[in-house]
Amino acid sequence: MSDDNSHSSDTISNKKGFFSLLLSQLFHGEPKNRDELLALIRDSGQNDLIDEDTRDMLEGVMDIADQRVRDIMIPRSQMITLKRNQTLDECLDVIIESAHSRFPVISEDKDHIEGILMAKDLLPFMRSDAEAFSMDKVLRQAVVVPESKRVDRMLKEFRSQRYHMAIVIDEFGGVSGLVTIEDILELIVGEIEDEYDEEDDIDFRQLSRHTWTVRALASIEDFNEAFGTHFSDEEVDTIGGLVMQAFGHLPARGETIDIDGYQFKVAMADSRRIIQVHVKIPDDSPQPKLDE
């Protein structure tokens, strides 16, 4: 038995030695800091050692270590909630309309979170008398986390504690939003769409507090109006054109450029055009003004 363990340890050691040697040969030494590691990942993509999706996921994993829950949470104003005194039918109306599976339950307002309701917990009441339904019978305890919690630690907590949603509070104890495990995973693997996600032509969609998805065909005029910017549309009309002009070439997915303090990352592109970008606005910028 000990011989087997010794053989296994030797094998692992040999593998580690092999990969260290490989890194040394390809990249002239192992990375010493975060910037060198990022450069190594990008070089690996350019050398076709990893594909674009893998590169983006590796970069995403590194990015979450620098972010706080406040950066990715769903803002309080966009939270879809249920009220503690709602009937079964009223709850079902909200669930069907939103197609969500978890809901904060409030009493008076969004600062008074009573717990979390999971849509699946309503199924037994749909087969019996709806009058038997009571929110108290299905209410689950809400997990509360501070805005300042690191995203990587939040993901670890989601996994270890096996829950998918947490209520986010500010330093004064007021509710500022909510965060889900899906929000974090989307930072790593990109937007997760399911059968209930509708394909639409919305130009601007919020991903986190400071990051927005923007269609490349969105006009610069509309972007300026929404984000309070002053990008010129004299030479190009669209955000995709603005980004391509700034790069000076057709950028590949994952390439990033800073334009007047706004960080533009190519989220989708093909061999002919940019399709979608992620825009990170400066921390001190006001939230965009969008038509409801």
Curated annotation (Swiss-Prot):
Q: What SUPFAM superfamilies does the annotation carry?
A: CBS-domain pair, FAD-binding/transporter-associated domain-like
Domain CBS: residue ranges:
73-133, 135-195
- Tell me the function of this protein: Plays a role in the transport of magnesium and cobalt ions.
Q: Name one Pfam family in it.
A: CorC_HlyC
InterPro entries named in the record: CBS_dom (IPR000644), CBS_dom_sf (IPR046342), CorC_N (IPR054115), FAD-bd_PCMH-like_sf (IPR036318), FAD-bd_PCMH_sub2 (IPR016169), Ion_transp-like_CBS (IPR044751), Transptr-assoc_dom (IPR005170)
Any one GO CC term of the record: plasma membrane
- Protein's recorded name: Magnesium and cobalt efflux protein CorC
Fetch the CDD domains from UniProt: CBS_pair_CorC_HlyC_assoc (cd04590)
